[in-house]
């Protein structure tokens, strides 16, 4: 058997991982500006954490979860999304306690797992970035969180991103709309896909979210959720729209958007862009005021979003956005002869401790091959170290661009390498 990675997974190799690190650093730095702190939860959870919160009728639970019984016969699932684990942690660790500052803002970056058909930007193990804000029902929280996503795309230079917006209202509004949707769809039940027929009585809003052609056709003239919002729900949505207008963030009201998870209420949103004439959602989220109490905590308003790193990097690539990845080293040490091996090790360590990036030859190659490696590594400076340099405790260093050379004592190199770089015009 040829040993290979499982279908739907990937190896992120050196070089490619530098792009990931750059994007992740941009994300972390931006989230700090909005006062979000990182949370890290387990990669696997009890099955009920996901099934009960995400929704028993969702595709995630019915088709896509990786779940198993462990040796203690506990029903376990690899996490398919990040919000439910964070809410579980919020309740379990009593972060709702009065001594914890509100709103509580957290973000995560990590692997998620769904059994899906692998395609560009969608894998069975994928990496998700998410933010969760607990304790504020102010519409400004909705807008600030959406604006943070918008801010991220601006920082990365991503173009042609459209914000789609909708409201699911409060539970009373949603229930009234649910019944209206059942009344509309029941007479045309036979025209729906098999999945949507099954969902019609369990969760008819799922039909709006279906990608099946027959379902899309069936809901074209379906009633709009916005016609069923009560006064408080309408006021919340109006405030969100007004604040987005004030921040000059354009949006499209999309009444067929319901999101793929059952725990949302009030504001929901997606950021969508086009790749090769195909629409691609790159960030999505909304308000979920009932989820904390569902996990046994107190009534707590909450808002958040998730975005896929694979999709984000795919879009950056397709839009031709080059990331400023640093791929240089400060010094390459060419080592000539076994006598210089220990000295090269000693000098390299001393320079690294001063905060510089150093590589050296380990393979005893000819000098020409070593110089070629220095060029491959984009070394700013080359040091050529042999037995005579070891004896004299002095060595020549060369600026790899200007070819300027200086001769410096080992002592100076080990104590003040920055002054050596200045002598070379660096």
UniProtKB/Swiss-Prot annotation:
It catalyses: tRNA(His) + L-histidine + ATP = L-histidyl-tRNA(His) + AMP + diphosphate + H(+). One of its GO terms (biological process) is histidyl-tRNA aminoacylation. SUPFAM superfamilies: Class II aaRS ABD-related, Class II aaRS and biotin synthetases. This is Histidine--tRNA ligase. It comes from Streptococcus agalactiae serotype V (strain ATCC BAA-611 / 2603 V/R). Homodimer. GO terms for cellular component: cytoplasm. Belongs to the class-II aminoacyl-tRNA synthetase family. GO terms for molecular function: ATP binding; catalytic activity, acting on a protein; histidine-tRNA ligase activity; transferase activity. Pfam families: HGTP_anticodon, tRNA-synt_His. It is found in: Cytoplasm. Its EC number is 6.1.1.21. Keywords: Aminoacyl-tRNA synthetase, ATP-binding, Cytoplasm, Ligase, Nucleotide-binding, Protein biosynthesis. CDD domains: HisRS-like_core, HisRS_anticodon. It comes from the Bacteria.
